[in-house]
């Protein structure tokens, strides 16, 4: 049986490989086989970061790569990475990086 640290690392790898999917805490918890409450607790214990924050940060990092290396419209990037709207993407992006995604 895998220890909790190995399970979390496996989950991080899975998340990082599925950033183009609609990822939410419920989906990740089902994948891990834990309740979402338990998963959030052990994820934070092992990484120091809340699970939702980790997913959002990884998606935003991927959005920078896509925006910097293509002419893809911001809306397309936002939707492809699972944001509900360009507005919600813009808010998250600005909160994370202090500037609008159009700068990239």
Features from the language model and the residues they span:
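Key DNA-contact positions within bacterial/archaeal DNA-binding proteins
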Residues: 37, 86-87, 102
């Amino acid at each position: 049986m895998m220890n909790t640290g190995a399970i979390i690392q496996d989950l991080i790898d899975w998340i990082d490989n599925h950033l183009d999917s609609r990822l939410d805490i419920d989906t990740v918890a089902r994948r891990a086989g834990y309740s979402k409450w338990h998963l959030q607790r052990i994820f934070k214990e092992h990484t120091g970061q809340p699970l939702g924050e980790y997913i959002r940060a990884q998606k935003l990092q991927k959005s920078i790569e896509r925006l910097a290396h293509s002419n893809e419209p911001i809306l397309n990037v936002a939707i492809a990475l699972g944001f509900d709207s360009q507005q919600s993407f813009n808010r998250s992006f600005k909160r994370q990086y202090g500037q609008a995604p159009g700068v990239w």
